[in-house]
UniProtKB/Swiss-Prot annotation:
Cellular component GO terms held in the UniProt record: cytosolic small ribosomal subunit; rough endoplasmic reticulum
Keywords from the named record: Cytoplasm, Endoplasmic reticulum, Hydroxylation, Ribonucleoprotein, Ribosomal protein
Name of the protein described by the UniProt record: Small ribosomal subunit protein uS12
Localization annotation: Cytoplasm, Cytosol; Cytoplasm; Rough endoplasmic reticulum
Keyword hit for Endoplasmic reticulum: yes
Species of provenance: Brugia malayi (Filarial nematode worm)
Amino acid sequence: MGKPKGIRAARKLKTHRQAQRWNDKGYKKAHLGTRWKANPFGTASHAKGIVLEKVGVEAKQPNSAIRKCVRVQLIKNGKKITAFVPNDGCLNFIEENDEVLVAGFGRKGHAVGDIPGVRFKIVKVANTSLIALFKGKKERPRS
């Protein structure tokens, strides 16, 4: 069969190309807008939330570790997410019912490294940078 050729074939070629474009994974991702619908943050880069509980997530094979994470309920829409707590001992700065600032974790909405299903990380606790607490530059505010 092949494609139509000739002087009046442009419309047919154009509409066929438009229809076939939707089979391209990258095109579909860019044009459907599901990136914003599926993302708990909506269109934002960061979101505030309340810590529900501390959880340990087992690392994927071949690693053997328990990665320290927290379950967070976002204030803006009530969605519950799991967020990674970076650096050694930083879980000690976080308590239940704390307000935390959560950011993405790298790979554009995908899990990172050996931590399955965790797409976010903690940036601030009680309006204080987690790194500043970790380095000892700031102390946790007393509530």
